[in-house]
């Protein structure tokens, strides 16, 4: 059985994969202050929550964009399961040609999303991940990673607005009932939500104009589903895209 760990800037998702139809996950806060023992407790909770036999776990893969946390998690897993985790990008290379000026700059999460996507949809395609940052990752018709775009995430935008203004409140991100807000909270919610809908549709249109072809679109990430509900273009929402990427990588 495979244990997959996706360490993001805000949350760390732990998942076990029996097959593509059997994926179970839990998310924990990516806290730089957590100790090795704190992470050991998180992983033990995960195993107990799903009633998993730790002796059945024979492979562990880690995708990480937070090196400081990655080191602690690696040691916690070695201590708990007596298995050496494999770090994607270092111990395991993703079989994807990267057309980037400096390929080492591309985060493991972005490459993993791109690799997972070409196992789900036909290229050319765009994988869009709505996390702490919103990332667009472009795979060309030859299944090569061409690069992408990076924006502040929805939550990051709300936090910035709240911290940089005197009177604007911090609001929950949700789909507004009307485009025009009737109070401060609904105005911010509409601005964030509808602004990102327009951002996604506009950027995709510009990419398709530049490449002179249509792209398949796949969405993932914490706010991917709520954006998916109003996106006015054909697309797929895949909740477990990074975790499935690890599955496909293991089977490659």
UniProtKB/Swiss-Prot annotation:
Keywords: ATP-binding, Coenzyme A biosynthesis, Cytoplasm, Kinase, Metal-binding, Nucleotide-binding, Potassium, Transferase
EC class name: transferase
Binding site for ATP: 6-13, 132
Keyword Kinase part of the UniProt annotation: yes
Alphabetized GO MF terms: ATP binding; metal ion binding; pantothenate kinase activity
Role played: Catalyzes the phosphorylation of pantothenate (Pan), the first step in CoA biosynthesis.
Any one GO cellular component localisation term in the record: cytoplasm
Keyword ATP-binding: yes
Protein name, entry field: Type III pantothenate kinase
Reaction catalyzed: (R)-pantothenate + ATP = (R)-4'-phosphopantothenate + ADP + H(+)
Record organism: Sulfurihydrogenibium sp. (strain YO3AOP1)
Residues forming the catalytic site: 109
Binding locations of K(+): 129
Domain of life of the source: Bacteria
PANTHER family in UniProt: TYPE III PANTOTHENATE KINASE
